[in-house]
Amino acid sequence: MRISITALCLLFIAGSCTETTKSPVDWLIDGSGYVSSVKETDNRLIMTNGLISRTFSLSPDGATIGFSNIIKGTELLRSVKPEAIVTINGYPMKIGGLTGQPVSNYLTDEWISLMKPDTISPFVLTAHKTGEILPRFDWKKRLEWMPKDLPWPPRGKSVDFTFSARKYISVSEGLEVTVHYEIYDGIPLICKWISVVNNTGHEIIINSFISEILAFTEAESAVGDKNNWILPDIYVETDYAFGGSMSSESCFEKSVWWVPDPDYKTIVNYNRIQPSLLECRPVTGPSERVSPGGSFSSFRTWILVNDSSNRERNGLAQRKMYRTIAPWITENPVFMHLRNADTASIKNAVDQCIETGFEKIILSFGSGFNIEDTSISNLNRFKELTDYAHRRGITLGGYSLLASRKIGGGHDVVMPPGRQPVFGNSPCLGSSWGEEYFRKLYRFIKYTGFDNFEHDGSYPGDVCASNMHPGHLGYEDSQWKQFRVITDFYKWCRGRGVYLTVPDWYFLNGSSKTGMGYRESNWSLPRRQQEIIERQNIFDGTWEKTPSMGWMHVPLVEYQGGGSEATIEPLKEHLPHYGQRLADLFGAGVQAAWRGNRLYDAPETLELVKKWVSFYKKHRTILDADIIHVRRPDGKDIDAILHADPANEEKGLLMIYNPLDHPVRKDLKVNIYYTGLSKFAVISENDKPGHRYRIDRNYEIILPVNIEANGESWYIIK
C-alpha cells in the first residue's frame, strides 16, 4: 500500500535577477545567491535582491513607484500613494507621494514621468542615504541552545529617505521625517518604519500615523460584495502585535489593515468596498509627546512576498523570515517546569537535569516562587540557587503572571464603556503598581542572574482611560505606552541572554517561544488520547512556527483533574506512555514544559529519558529544522513529519509514528524536495546502515517502512 504526499511545487525559480544576484536555485533551498543591492539611475532608486525589488522616485518627490515580485515576474503595485501620513498637533500631513495618475488600475513609466509632487504635502524629499542594516536591539546569543549560529543584525541593505519642511509652510517648520527601509539577503522581504525629529523649539504631539500605504493589485475581481475577500499574495507582520492569540494574526486590525482605496474609482467591485489598500497604523494613538530636540519612531512593518499559493511553501517562507529578523527563536533549550520552589526541590531538579541532559529549569506556576518578592533574603536565596545551577551548567528562571490579574486600588485598566479587558481583568502597566512591578522584575533578574523568564498573560493590548496613572496621560496614549513598557523589558532581557517564553506573539521584540497551540484541559484526558492529540497539536502548530517557537505541556503530575488514568506519575509505572511522549516531542524538535517534581524515579526511567534527550542532541540541527507536514495524526494509520535542512549534512529526518495496536508495513511515498537532494538519497532507519534510493522527477522516493505496534521509527536522509 502506498500513501501519496502532495508534491511540493516551485521546482525552478523563474524570472530575471540583478547582476549581483544571479542564481538558478530556489531561494528556500539555497538563498546565498540572492544578495541585496541598492542602485540609482534616472532619478530613481531601486532596492533589490533578485527575488523582489522596490523602486522609488527621487524627483520631483520621493515615492514608491514600483514593487515587483521578480520570482514570478509580476508587478504588485497599481498606484502611487504617500510614503506615510503623520498627524502632528491634530494636523494630518502626507509624506512624499506623487499625483496625476489617470487611473488606479495600473501604473506605467510614461505616467510616472508626467506625475507631480503633492502640493498639499508640507514635506519634500531632501536627502537619502544607503547603508548596512543595524541591530534593532542587542542579542546575547546562547549558542549552546542553537542548532547553528545566525547573523545579527541580518545581512542586507538599508535606505533612509529624509523629508524636510517645504519653505513658507509653518505647520511643518522645524520637523523632519525619515522613512527607513531594509531589504534582506536571500529572502523576498522588506522592512519599513518612520521616524520624526522635533526641531521646532516646542513640544509636539504625534497624534497618529500611517507608516505604510501601498495600493496593491487586487487578488480577485468581483462585481458584488463578499464576506471574505482574497487578499494580495503577500504576508505582512509588524512588531506591534499582541492580543494573547499565540498566532501571527495578532497584528491584524491592531497594526495591519486591508481597507478600500477611496481613490480607486475604476475598481470592478460596484460598491468600491473591496480591500485593495494596505495600511499599517496603530488602532489607537500613539498620542506621543515629543520634546524639543527629541524624536519618535513608529513600529516596523515587514512585507514578505509569496511566490506560491502552496501552504507549506508559504509557511516555510514565513519561518525563514523569523530566522532572519528574529534569530533568537532558534534557541531551543530542553527544560523542566518545576512544581516546587523550595531549596531542596530546586537542587534535586538541577541534579536530575544534569543526569538526563536537560538544560533549563523554570519555577512553575503554583510552585511558591514569587518574582515580586524582592526582599534581600529572597534575592540572596535565589542568587545562591542560580549560582548553584550555573556551576553545574543548568540555567534557572521563573514564572510570573501579569494580565488576567485584578490588582484593585485604582491600578487596573479603566476600559471605555462597553469594553472589557482581553482576559477579563488586567492591571495597567502605566499605573504606579505597574511601574513598581517592572522595577521588581529588573531588580530580581539583575541581582540573581536568572537567565530565563516565563511571562504569562503578557500585555494583551488593553487600553486604559484613566488620567491618574503616572505612565500615561489618558486613553489615546495608553496602548502605545504600555506596549513600550513591556517590549523595552523584553529587549533588555534579550540583551542579557535571558530566554523568554511568552504566550503571545512577541517574537519580533525578543521572545523566543509561545504556546504551540493546545487546550490545557486535554492533559486531563486518558494517557493514550493525549499521545495522538499531542502530535496533532505539533502538526497544526508548525505551519507558521519553527519547532523551537512553540512549547508543549506534559504534566508529570495530575493537572486539572483526570486522576490516575491521566497522570504519568509514578513515572516507572507508565514507561511506555512516558517514552511515547518523549518520542513525540523530541522527534519533532519541540520542547515541552515537563511539569512535576522529578524527571525520573528509577534507573529504567532515567535510561528512557536519557535515550531521547541524547537522540535530540545528536540530531539537534536537523530536528530544529523546519517541519514538512507529511500525514496528520488521526489514530487510523501512521502519521509522519519530515524535518528538512538542505544546508545540513543530515538533509532530512523523517519521523513516523504508529498509534495502532498492530504493526504497519507499507511503501511510503515521500516528497523530499526541501532537503535539497535531487538524484539520490541515502536513508538510514534508527541509525542503522543506510540504503540508496533514487529520487524521481517529482522529488519523491518510495520508502518501505515497517513500524511496530504503538511504536515509532526515524529515518536520516543524506
Where are these regions (language model features)?
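Active-site-proximal loop/short-helix segments
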Residues: 364-372, 376, 410-420, 454-479, ...
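Bacterial Sec-dependent signal peptides at the C-terminal "C-region" and cleavage site
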Residues: 12-24
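Alpha-helix-loop-beta-strand connector modules within alpha/beta enzyme cores
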Residues: 382-394, 478-498
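Solvent-exposed beta-strand/loop surfaces of large extracellular or lumenal domains
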Residues: 268-279, 678-702
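Conserved structural scaffold segments of CAZyme catalytic domains across common CAZy folds
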Residues: 25-26, 100-411, 435, 590-636, ...
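Sec-dependent N-terminal signal peptides
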Residues: 4-13
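Active-site-adjacent "subsite" loops/lids of carbohydrate-active enzymes
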Residues: 326, 342, 380-387, 391, ...
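Active-site-proximal substrate-binding groove within the catalytic cores of carbohydrate-active enzymes
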Residues: 45, 49-52, 486-690, 702-706, ...
